[in-house]
Amino acid sequence: MDCKLHAKNCGGCPLLGLDYAAQLKQKEEKVRALLGKYGPVHPIRGMEQPYHYRNKVISTFAVGWGGKLTSGIYAANSHKVLPVESCLLQDEVLDKTMQAVRAAANACRYQPYDEDKGTGLVRHCLLRRGVATGQVMVVLVTAQPVLPGAKNFVKALLAETAQRGVTVTTVVQNVNSRKTSVVLGEAEKVLYGKGFILDTLCGKTYAISPRSFYQVNPAQTAVLYGLAVEAAKLTGKEVVLDAYCGIGTIGLTAADHAKQVVGVELNRDAVQDAIGNAKHNGVKNARFFAADATRWISEAAAAGEKADVIFMDPPREGSTPEFLASVARMAPKRVVYVSCNPVTLARDLATLTKLGYKAEGFTPVDMFPHTEHIETVCALSKRDIHGKKPSGRR
């Protein structure tokens, strides 16, 4: 499929020129080359419609033609903003919403932030959509706490989105006055609605705030988490540890099939979301704690605590030797490793294999079509497990 942005050095879809079937084959072969020696690699799970899957958009403001405000993404290997009217990966509702944001911002005569001079007002716009609910969030990131004519901006935005057939659920101002490439700041002000949206995933409803971690491809996330829970082989009697749990999506998906779930996540905002999500869904057998996963599991293992199943979903850099050693000390019957980087998964598997775990198999999931990223679900098992269960310690 042709894309004008791809021809302008967008850099967001390096595999766009490759037939989708060939993309899937390439990714599956990469996983097999890296992980095949540890166990069988099952066919990759691709998408039937590998376009417009992203439920989250981040757009950067800049000066466009005629001095008007425009927005888009940085061109590859540069700080030049490439204007974006629409994108083959983005939810089409969010494309229309961003068009409305630009129109409203121009109507209010907002000036884009200049990162070199430190002048201007609006820096970025973050958009999120609950695909199952249709709810839309607009987050306007400003360099200053005061947003002149905030009510007029909201009024103009709602009018512009309505003209495009879009209903906005909430509008939030996020303040980021630092000189940084990080998009969001710490301070927020709700300008319209409740400041969050809802979405449904794997039978559970999640509240998504501006800073919440939530997978950008809900269709493939359901596939990924379904595979992970299936790999755990839960019977309803297990105590489960959900490490690097984020807002609790894997743990809450597994909770219906387990005796108890204990989730651990470093990001305190995410943990608060996880606790709220458990309450909202009536899940009473899940507890979540804000802590570094390596430190938490090391202390739990040193205290002699055990788990029947451990889910681990670490960042791209993978886990740590200390974490993996503590996994072995906790002696779960099964470990389900959800990886977003097959290179670090291979590294961690070498350690887990030495610690007595065997990989039963790997299923790649194409979470991000037209990019080089690959998600992989790996199930590992170990026999003769005995000991105490996690107590939900702090």
Predicted regions and their residues:
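Short cysteine clusters
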Residues: 3-5, 10-13, 340
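Extended interfacial segments that mediate partner engagement and assembly in macromolecular machines
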Residues: 11-114, 127, 132, 146-147
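Extracellular/lumenal ectodomain signal focusing on beta-strand-rich modules
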Residues: 43, 56, 124, 170, ...
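Nucleotide donor/acceptor-binding cores
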Residues: 55, 134-136, 237-238
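Short, acidic/hydrophobic/Gly-rich beta-strand patch recurrent on exposed beta strands
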Residues: 72-75, 139-141, 274
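Short helix/loop segment immediately N-terminal to the Walker
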Residues: 112-119, 240
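Short, aliphatic-rich beta-strand segments
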Residues: 127, 134-143, 205-209, 309
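Rossmann-like S-adenosyl-L-methionine
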Residues: 148-394
